[in-house]
A protein has these predicted regions:
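Extracellular S/T/G-rich loop segment that most often corresponds to the catalytic His/Ser-adjacent loop
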Residues: 1-65, 116
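Glycine-centered flexibility motif
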Residues: 19, 75, 108-110
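C-terminal domain-closing interface element
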Residues: 100-119
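Hydrolase catalytic cores
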Residues: 35-102
Length: 119
């Protein structure tokens, strides 16, 4: 799952879902992406700033698509999909300052970092 953080302030977005799963064996979200004041197109034309996990998730989706292009289309790893993509994204997640325990219930494994996700 994807949570949101404020990339300008390098802080957790308080509206973002957080916590342990019902079994208390997993922490969610898995990682976070920018989700505060994201510039996007507005209905009716023009641009606006939007906030929410609905604006954080496309960052992770785009990162996964680029990884799959690199692996599958360009022939670097023909089996780069699903859990393997998730594993690489989590492994490369960056930690925000001020948090001592990783993963944690606010930020999961950390913030999205596509650059460090590829092997």
């Amino acid at each position: 799952s994807v949570g949101a953080y404020n990339s300008a302030l390098q802080s957790y977005a308080d509206f973002s879902g957080r916590g342990f799963t019902r079994s208390f064996q997993e922490i969610k979200p898995d990682l976070v992406a920018p989700g505060v004041n994201i510039q996007s197109t507005k209905s009716g034309g023009g641009y606006g700033a939007f906030t929410g996990t609905s604006f954080a998730t496309p960052f992770v989706t785009g990162a996964a698509a680029l990884m799959m292009e690199w692996g599958i289309i360009r022939g670097n790893d023909p089996f780069l999909y699903g859990e393997k993509v998730k594993s690489y994204l989590i492994k490369a997640a960056r930690h925000l300052p001020g948090y001592e325990v990783w993963p944690n219930p606010q930020l999961g494994w950390g913030t999205l970092c596509l650059r460090d996700s590829l092997p």
